[in-house]
Amino acid sequence: MSISIESARHIFPETLAADVVPATIARFKQLRIEDRLALIWFAYLEMGKKLSIATPDEVNMRFVSSTLSQIERMSFAEQEQLMCDLASGTDRPICRIYATWSANIKLGFWFQLGKWMEAGIVTPIPQGYELSANALAVLQAIRDVDPGQQITILRNTVVDMGFDTSQLENYSRVAEPVVPPKEISDKNRITAIPGVENPIILEYMNNMNANQFDALIQLFAPDGGLQPPFQRPIVGSDKILTFFHEDCQNLKLLPEKGVIEPAEDGYTRIKITGKVQTPWFGKDVGMNIAWRFLLNPENQIFFVAIDLLASPKELLNLGH
């Protein structure tokens, strides 16, 4: 059987991803608009009590400053309508602008709105607002999962808001500036992963941690693919590099163990489990992650799937 991106997606099929994440997001999208906004607010308040959320970078916030200034000048009724329009994907200028922002810029925008709601600058959720039974069930589902899954759910709820970009004829993606690559010091270099000695995997981890994305993309086959959690594969060097710049800056990968095994036609399957820390939550949240690599006979990365695992015990599951 010939190797393809589609067939590569199924390596290490016993890997148990956190299916509760897309399931909860799907339930969230079925809620009425008012409940969606209230649920985000209640979840934001609860997470703020448990986790230290990093203040968004000032450079990133300059992309939203004009929009935030408009919102600050609005009446409470206008602010409420705008947030409803963002949640429902209404076609209006601010919703179109929002749709062009990268995930991190959208997160920074909602972080600032949350701060302003606490300060009374932006209309708060009405005092005594009661979530519907369905919304309460979704909120409880968010409470029941681990912090890494919680922030993934909340991230995706706001990332999917705004006007549908597929209906925009021409637009430019607005992303934060590419941060300069870091030196890979001896102190921070990953020199070994128990069970895996392949140098390409070590280079992948070290280059990602150092924001050395130009070097990182050279590890991939030209027709290679990368599958982020709960998404379809991204195929081709240019598209993968864009993903690195927009979604992977300042991540900290902490691989713990792995397994390597031959596959047909000279390919090699490698599975690594470990944790990833994000710049938003740092050491407070370590996401439980599996990386499922398929290397081609030239020892290039033909495919890698990144899975948010169902539970910490899955870190020990290296079976196939």
State the predicted function of each range.
Residues 186-190, 225-235:
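A short gly/proline-enriched turn/hairpin at secondary-structure junctions
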Residues 146, 221, 296:
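Short conserved AdoMet
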Residues 179-188, 241, 245-320:
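A beta-strand edge to alpha-helix "cap/lid" segment located at domain peripheries
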Residues 177-210, 218:
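Short, low-complexity N-terminal intrinsically disordered segments enriched in polar/charged residues
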Residues 1-187:
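Short amphipathic alpha-helical interaction elements located at domain edges
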Residues 210-223, 227:
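Short, well-ordered alpha-helical segments enriched in acidic and aromatic residues
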